[in-house]
Amino acid sequence: MMFTKALVAATLATLTAALPQPTVVRREGGDAGVTIVNNMDSDVYAWSVTDGVSKMHTLSSGGGSYTENFQANPNGGGVSIKLSTHQDQTDVLQFEYTKSGETIFWDMSCIDMDRAASTFTKNGFDVSPSQTSGDCPAVNCHAGDTSCAEAYLQPKDDHATHGCPIDTSFTLTLGA
């Protein structure tokens, strides 16, 4: 009788181990990150830049998207997701972020684009955090606004940097 119980227990343990087990993949930063949605009528190209440049990602016109979980830059600096309507990283709008303890610091930068002629300026863009506060606001640069005060227009525009809890997710909508 004891042998039968042991045999049944061993058989059940073997069968349980053989069943498919759910796999959980945890990327750096957990599930928090940024999703960029292209609602414009032209394709957008994206590169994630740390101490190197990622492959180019294409966000198709009319709703194509790119999602990136927050990552740390191996050289200790921030990360820049460069967005362009050209495949050569010219005239770029940037979503920039840096992980620091329990805070994600982020901003939008228009420094490296011709604001008067840019497709991003013509169509507008906005950033919606999953949780907002005084230090973690939404950002909206309306279509045609060449002087959007909520984005970096020159290197010293530090008022455009925001700090949010590290578990905040963002949606950047192009063509808002």
Swiss-Prot record:
InterPro entries per record: CetA-like (IPR006771), Osmotin/thaumatin-like_sf (IPR037176)
Family the UniProt entry places it in: Belongs to the thaumatin family.
Keyword Disulfide bond: yes
Disruption phenotype: No visible phenotype. The double deletion of cetA and calA results in cell wall defects and lyse during germination, leading to the inhibition of germination.
A single Gene Ontology CC term: extracellular region
Induction: Expression is inhibited by PKA activity and is subject to glucose repression. Expressed primarily in conidia. Expressed and secreted during germination and early growth.
Originating gene: cetA
Keywords, sorted A to Z: Cell wall, Disulfide bond, Extracellular matrix, Germination, Secreted, Signal
Coiled-coil residue windows: none
Cellular compartment(s): Secreted; Secreted, Extracellular space, Extracellular matrix; Secreted, Cell wall
Protein name listed in UniProt: Secreted thaumatin-like protein cetA
